[in-house]
């Protein structure tokens, strides 16, 4: 039985479980290597210099913008933004799966795997890693949604959404360029 209401409730439930699961696991962790550098650089570098720095050969202004905002708002407390981004990631993948295959309850199984997999613990408890892994997943979910709509006869708005998602992903990490190879 297909029901958008049931599917939507399932996605919201999985996003809420992800928020709790990631919040709990992350709150029991401490900062790691690059995390301390990110934190120190928010104080030692100017705002624009911090955003546009060459960090080990990487240009990641959106990543550093998020890091700067979180550090200024709540220094040493990155668990809430990571947990919220993880839950948002699940919600966006719920939309992407529905765009690909329709609002089917069976899609909650792979979404649940994404939401609760232990494979995402390490990338999300390490602040610097989560600033790269989560935006890539979110970018891919947005691109899949836009590409599915384009394939079904979407217009310029969906094409613009696809390109905008890629640009935002690239501002977080240049490896987002690899997301367009499958499309």
Protein language model regions, located:
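Membrane-interface transmembrane helices that cradle and orient dolichyl/undecaprenyl
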Residues: 140-159
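Transmembrane-helix motifs of polytopic, lipid-linked glycan transferases
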Residues: 83-107, 142, 146
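Aromatic- and kink-enriched transmembrane "portal" helix at the membrane-lumen/periplasm boundary
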Residues: 82, 107-139
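Start-transfer (signal-anchor) and selected internal transmembrane alpha helices
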Residues: 1-19
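Short hydrophobic/aromatic helix or loop-helix immediately within or flanking a transmembrane segment
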Residues: 52-75
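Extracytosolic helix-loop segments that constitute the early lumenal/periplasmic catalytic or substrate-binding loops
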Residues: 36-55, 62
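Helix-to-loop transition at the C-terminal end of transmembrane segments
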Residues: 20-38
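Membrane-interface alpha helices of multi-pass inner-membrane proteins
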Residues: 158-173, 179-182
């Amino acid at each position: 039985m297909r029901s958008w209401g049931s599917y939507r409730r399932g996605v919201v439930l999985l996003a809420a479980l992800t928020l709790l699961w990631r919040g709990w696991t992350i709150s029991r962790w401490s900062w790691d290597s690059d995390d301390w550098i990110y934190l120190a650089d928010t104080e030692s570098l100017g705002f624009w210099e911090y955003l546009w720095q060459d960090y080990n050969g990487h240009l990641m202004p959106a990543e550093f913008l998020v890091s700067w905002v979180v550090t200024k708002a709540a220094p040493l407390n990155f668990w809430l933004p990571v947990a919220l981004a993880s839950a948002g990631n699940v919600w966006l993948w719920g939309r992407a799966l529905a765009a690909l295959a329709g609002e089917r309850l069976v899609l909650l199984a792979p979404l649940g795997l994404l939401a609760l997999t232990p494979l995402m613990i390490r990338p999300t408890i390490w602040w610097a890693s989560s600033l790269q892994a989560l935006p890539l997943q979110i970018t891919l979910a947005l691109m899949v949604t836009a590409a599915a709509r384009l394939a079904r006869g979407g217009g310029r708005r969906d094409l613009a959404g696809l390109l905008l998602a890629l640009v935002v992903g690239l501002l977080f990490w240049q490896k987002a360029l690899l997301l367009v190879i499958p499309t």
